[in-house]
Regions:
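Catalytic pocket-lining loop regions of alpha/beta-barrel enzymes
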Residues: 115-248
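Active-site gating loops and adjacent loop-to-helix segments of metal-dependent hydrolytic enzymes
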Residues: 9-46, 77, 83, 153-169, ...
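Hydrophobic/aromatic residues located in beta-strands of well-ordered beta-sheets
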Residues: 3, 64, 104-106, 146, ...
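Short, well-structured secondary-structure segments
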Residues: 43, 52-56, 60-85, 92-96, ...
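Long, low-complexity, intrinsically disordered polar/charged segments
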Residues: 27-30, 34-35, 112-125
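Charged helix-capping and loop-helix junction motifs
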Residues: 82-89, 128-134
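Short glycine-enriched loops at secondary-structure junctions
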Residues: 69, 110-112, 150-154, 254-255
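Mid-to-C-terminal alpha-helical segments outside catalytic/metal-binding sites
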Residues: 1-6, 12-63, 91-98, 200-201, ...
């Protein structure tokens, strides 16, 4: 077994250069990333391979699964621009994976699946499962998994934390409900991981129960929730609702500080932490 972090983001040097060369969102201005939802200061050193491997050692993580966060807005670009940036990220990521001595695995950002353990998509894409079907069929054929991440989007006149606290959870709740409504029955064996506890899925299941839905019918052993950005109370509720076998550890490094979530997971004791960080995510990997 391997201690795994299923939710990290890593920008290859060529991708950083490509963002720095742009003048429309998403782009980099020095160490500030300019997105449709605002401007955010970054420490670009967090995307250096050596520093990332040191962070894995610090957290006791043996393998990190890295993806390109859909919140930067590539899905809102013209197809040609998006495809160019995706290709740069995927090629650079495969090079980093090859250089990391087995410490990294990658998720496709929408290009080729070759060399990747799965694919990451934005939450909004689950609103049109027919359009997503070719990717889902191919993932199922390969025995790979789908990772659903918040899509993000432009916001105006809101504080910097607005998207993370209001937009992302709502998007993930909608994605989770879209999957329950139309995806699960079509791809019942495809492993699907919803980031950030699907935006608070247990609360939504209680709402479903008030509408006459048998909550037990919504629990599926191919659907997983990652723990990124949450602490003990939220994780405990998910364990009570879904069972510990459906939770996987995610940190959202370098976007979020991993320490609070990691501390919460470890606080449940060795057996629970072993399931969330080791047994469950390992089931998703080839």
């Amino acid at each position: 077994m391997t201690v795994v972090d299923l939710h990290q983001h890593l920008w290859p040097e060529a991708f950083v250069s490509a963002l720095s060369a742009r003048t429309e969102p998403p782009f980099l201005r020095g160490s500030t990333v300019v997105l449709g939802e605002g401007e955010f200061d970054l420490d670009l050193r967090e995307h250096e391979l050596g520093r990332r491997l040191a962070a894995l050692d610090r957290d006791g993580t043996e393998l990190a699964v890295v993806s390109l966060q859909t919140t930067i807005g590539l899905d809102r670009l013209p197809p040609g621009e998006r495809a160019e940036l995706v290709e740069i990220w995927e090629e650079g990521t495969l090079e980093l994976v090859a250089s990391a001595d087995g410490r990294l695995a990658g998720l496709s950002a929408g290009g080729s699946l070759d060399g990747f353990v799965g694919a990451a998509v934005g939450s909004d894409s689950l609103a049109n499962l027919d359009a997503l079907a070719p990717l889902l069929d191919e993932l199922a054929r390969r025995g790979a998994f789908l990772f659903v991440h918040p899509s993000g989007g432009p916001v105006e006149g809101r504080p910097p934390w607005w998207s993370a606290a209001a937009v992302y959870p709502a998007q993930m709740q909608a994605a989770y409900m879209n999957w329950l409504a139309g995806g699960q029955e079509r791809w019942e064996s495809l492993p699907v991981v919803f980031a950030i506890l699907a935006g608070g899925a247990p609360f939504q299941l209680e709402r479903l129960a008030t509408r006459g839905v048998d909550v037990r019918s919504t629990l599926h052993d191919n659907v997983y929730l990652d723990t990124a950005s949450y602490g003990r109370r939220a994780i405990e509720l998910c364990i009570e609702t879904f069972g510990v076998a459906q939770l996987v550890y995610g940190s959202d490094i370098p976007v979020a500080d991993a320490a609070p979530t990691l501390r919460a997971v470890l606080g449940f004791g060795e057996s629970v932490a072993h399931m969330i960080r080791d047994v469950n995510p390992t089931r998703l990997l080839p």
